[in-house]
A protein has these predicted regions:
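Conserved amphipathic alpha-helical segments that form helical-bundle/coiled-coil interaction surfaces
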Residues: 24-103, 115-118, 122, 132-142, ...
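Generic C-terminal helix-cap and adjacent flexible tail
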Residues: 146-161
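Short, 15-30-residue, compositionally biased linear elements
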Residues: 108-116
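Short linear motifs at protein or domain termini
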Residues: 1-30, 37, 154, 158
Length: 161
């Protein structure tokens, strides 16, 4: 497994990519809600300011119809940084490598809802609301999971034509 593909996405055939993406979201659901909750508990003012800035940047890029993937990745990395836990930061460096593939598979049809979900997560973290941050992240990732399933259904329908 190459360092730039630690999750093994490129090792999969096209038909297995959807399953791999679902597995990726399952892992993110195990990890990121707790990252968000810990971030709400541990983030200081400067952490929250940076998270808010990144959240706004993602929103502006989406509103302008520009590529927002790099900013989205930085947002998720900042979430981990807000925990003040280096192991979580290291794990997030690996986890975010799957985000571009997810955007590709879902044809980026979720960008506007991502902005709203990120806003809710950011507000909860900034308010020190661990439960709100946790549930906001669960909502965000569950929405992502539904979009993968929708994309898979659409691909199967196209193949059956």
């Amino acid at each position: 497994m190459a360092n730039d593909d630690p999750l093994g996405f490129r090792e999969n055939s096209e038909e297995k990519l959807f399953q791999t993406c679902l597995e990726f979201v399952d892992v993110r659901l195990m990890l990121e809600p707790e990252v968000a909750a810990m971030a709400a508990t541990n983030a200081d003012y400067a952490d929250c300011q940076k998270l808010q800035m990144l959240q706004r940047e993602v929103g502006q890029l989406v509103d302008q119809g520009k590529d927002h993937i790099a900013a989205d990745i930085e947002y998720h990395k900042q979430l981990a940084a807000c925990t003040h836990n280096q192991i979580l930061c290291n794990l997030m460096e690996i986890v975010v490598k799957g985000i571009p593939l997810f955007v590709k598979i879902t044809k980026n049809d979720f960008a506007k809802s991502t902005v709203e979900q990120h806003r809710a997560i950011t507000e909860a973290i900034s308010a020190g609301d661990a439960q709100g941050a946790r549930y906001g992240m669960i909502t965000h990732l569950n929405s992502n999971r539904k979009r993968i399933l929708k994309a898979l259904t659409e691909q199967k329908a196209t193949e059956n034509l």
